[in-house]
Regions:
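Short secondary-structure boundary segments
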Residues: 67-70, 175, 197, 233, ...
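N-terminal leader/targeting and accessory segments in enzymes
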Residues: 1-90, 236, 264-267, 286, ...
């Protein structure tokens, strides 16, 4: 692609040595990935400033550079822009030929429920005869090929590459607040956008819950001409978003328990795998929700309303739900020889953990046991509220480690001790090794116990633990098949 085509729609200051016909063979924002013929985009990142690596990029073969800082005297053309992140995303879209235009694009955002809603959508859409790609937290799935995810919302180059590679009719994207704030979805427009809910999360990144909401709501400004918004009204932030979009040209539909919702939940007939009664238009029908818990009632309703707007009847979609097999790392249940139930779940917010407890209570759990870990360099402000919640509900709370992310282990253990003393009245057990914490709960489990292991879901461990496993699920499977007690 020639330079002027790549810069189309991007405001830059063009240098004297600008060549509109300069052929660009690739784009990179990592100087180490540059090959001759590439353009380098210098981004002021969170851990390093890309402008420091311009010389390295040129040495590796970059033939042009885009950045924010005023820089002179380079041997290649340098284009200054006000926002190099936005420029990167727009150039990526230009480079790959605006691939979002060839797909029906569905964006899913919210604190909780993005992944489950995306998997539900993919299943229903594919069972209805359409092909579907997915970009999200667990995996990226393109043309039926599974690619392990690095982030919920990938960087702009990866997103546009995946969209260009996809031959599927529909693409579902989980859209994180980080992805929106960091301009990763710039240049992408959606046919459908879904808002699941909002809760206290990522407040180490966003200055307040209001700022977090405002970032999330920016997804709904990225709609195609006849775009449709699907909003959960049972959450106060969903109602605020509905009000915010009232004067927009797009169609806005809600699901919840209000009489004015497009899809209204009338009642829940059973609890664990809920059978629900739903009103849509003038008709009502019973629907079997394929996943446990009230939170999955809302996830299912959001998926059903979206596919209905795509032309798939609620009756047909509900029929397809019967063959849904679940989501990796989302409320995956495992039986214990003594009759206990172990659950691996990604839950890492108060709301998500409360949903887990509600399900256990509805199933008459005799005891709730929780193995809870926190990650280094993550939102520490929410930890005290989560520990307080867990200690109030659980018969046994075990505090353990999640990913350290460069924080010294001793410092994280001290943090667990402090949380235990201040917000759990010293009642929690502290077992830093995550696998040994799970083994401890496994060895002590009794009939009627519900044991939750939260925070990582399907994710692999980033450091080594005592047991020879790499995920929470593998740890449980190891303990189920171990013929002899595992040494401490």
């Amino acid at each position: 692609m020639i330079m002027d085509e790549l810069l189309n729609g991007i405001t830059v200051t063009k240098p004297e040595n600008h060549d509109p016909l300069l052929p660009i063979t690739g784009i990179q924002f990592n100087s180490r990935k540059i090959v001759p013929g590439d353009l380098f985009v210098a981004i002021d990142g969170f851990s390093a400033d890309g402008h420091r690596f311009i010389d390295q990029a040129i040495a590796n073969g970059a033939i042009a550079v885009v950045g924010q800082q005023p820089i002179a005297g380079l041997e290649v053309p340098y284009y200054q822009t006000s926002d190099s992140r936005k420029a990167l995303a727009r150039m990526a879209s230009n480079f790959y030929g605006h691939p979002c235009k060839k797909h029906i694009m569905i964006g899913v955002t919210g604190t909780n429920g993005k992944t489950t809603t995306a998997y539900l959508l993919k299943h229903i859409i594919e069972q209805s005869g359409r092909t579907c790609s997915m970009i999200g937290t667990v995996n990226n799935i393109i043309n039926n090929q599974v690619i392990k995810s690095k982030n919920t919302t990938p960087d702009p180059l990866e997103i546009q590459s995946l969209l260009a590679e996809s031959l599927d009719e529909v693409v579902i994207m989980e859209v994180s607040s980080h992805g929106i704030e960091q301009q990763r979805i710039e240049g992408i427009y959606f046919d459908y956008a879904i808002f699941t809910n909002l809760g206290n999360d990522h407040l180490d990144y966003h200055e307040s819950i209001e700022a977090y909401f405002n970032v999330k709501s920016r997804l709904f400004k990225r709609m195609k001409k006849h775009g449709t918004s699907i909003i959960a009204s049972h959450n106060e932030w969903g109602r605020k978003l509905q009000y915010k979009l009232a004067d927009s040209a797009q169609e806005v539909f809600t699901f919840g328990n209000r009489t004015d919702d497009e899809m209204q939940l009338i009642n829940v007939c059973t609890e664990y795998f809920p059978v629900i009664k739903v009103r849509h238009g003038k008709s009502t029908q019973k629907i079997q929700v394929p996943l446990p818990g009230m939170h999955n009632v809302w996830n299912t309703l959001g998926a059903l309303l979206t596919v209905e707007k795509m032309g798939i009847s609620i009756k047909e979609a509900a029929r397809h739900l019967s063959t849904f097999k679940g989501v990796p790392g989302r409320f995956e249940t495992f039986s214990h020889p003594e009759g206990a139930t172990f659950i691996v779940d990604y839950a890492h917010t108060e709301d998500a953990i409360e949903y887990c407890y509600q399900t256990a209570k509805r199933e008459n759990a005799e005891r709730i046991v929780h193995i809870l870990g926190f990650r280094g360099k993550r939102d520490s402000a929410k930890r005290k509220d989560i520990v307080s919640l867990c200690s109030d509900v659980c018969s046994q709370l075990i505090l353990t480690l999640d990913d350290l992310n460069g924080v010294p282990k001793d410092r994280m253990v001290d943090e667990l001790k402090k949380l235990n003393n201040e917000f759990a009245d010293g009642s929690a057990e502290i077992i830093p090794d995550r696998t040994k914490a799970i083994q401890h709960a496994w060895d002590k489990a009794k009939d009627g116990d519900w044991v939750f292991i939260t925070g990582k879901g399907q994710e692999t461990y980033k450091q080594s633990f005592k047991l020879p496993t790499s995920t929470d699920k593998q740890t449980i499977q190891f303990l189920k098949t171990a013929k002899h007690p595992v040494s401490s």
